[in-house]
């Protein structure tokens, strides 16, 4: 090819800025990255990401610097935009088996609505129940029931008192106990010296009278116990009738706010019924103890018990998809058992480790439900025990959050260890994008063919 001499001005390239289509390079932020020379990889990625079939996860082969991660993230976001927003995930207290919290899926945004609604119900009840129990109508009816029982008790005690007087005994009540003393001919209490001075025949009569009186006291107590229970049950029923409209009003308003069709609607209804029952069974916890000082131990115990009750009614929103417009795309750069599968936090109460449904935390797999998650094979393999657990997840498609996942929690054994929580497992639909080198891909094929076959979409970046 012949050589040609060029003039200096021919060595200078001049481009008109108006022809570029942008004012500054800042406008190029967010522009799609080109798949230069990677058309086959692009087609494979789009095929795998858009195919909604089980066991069609993606394995991305390519060397560092090939653009594999950036291009796959871009493709994942494009595919996610075509998918619906997945539901929220909540964990609820299990009233029958507290160690097994219930999982509840709700349409996106309604998990936050349920959590806030239950918080409002709790706050309103704490303010309204004491007011309702202090109302004139309630006090009048409670007083009537108390007077009815008091009349029965007074009549029965009057008979017992007459029985005691007929046997020359004086019957009194001291600190909830029945106390009787011998009386003389004029009804005055006998001193110990006077009692010892009585003739043997009289002392024998007194012994018989004392036995008869003790037996009569026993019959009196046997008669009063069921009457006391009936009074307490009547008062408890009155309290429930008085407070039930408040509880129903709060929970019905919450139900009406959740207008969308809920797949787990039956589960939610059952839980709300159990919440209502628990609140009505413990109405007394909402009312301060009138015979106790505000800082007394008994009042502190009541407040602690109320806090525990309301905690059981809390909603733990572990995955909140409110405000999303597409399926999630999660990039997990530090996969551990804790970050990938979730964990359970613990609290310390009176030197005892405690855990309940409010301590459940979601991992990346739960957050990616309905969408995509990107992992690097090298990172997963470097974490001890993580690959076998991921393999089990791929096999069954269900995720179980476990105690002590990834460390950081309390010891699983010992006197201060809590009863192990077993949150309800949940089905997770997620497309996994696993990035690795060519060597790692074929090593996986040889070492774990059963898992490798679940990555049927092979995205091969050419060098």
Show which residues each predicted segment covers:
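Non-catalytic accessory segments flanking P-loop/AAA+ NTPase cores
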Residues: 1-463
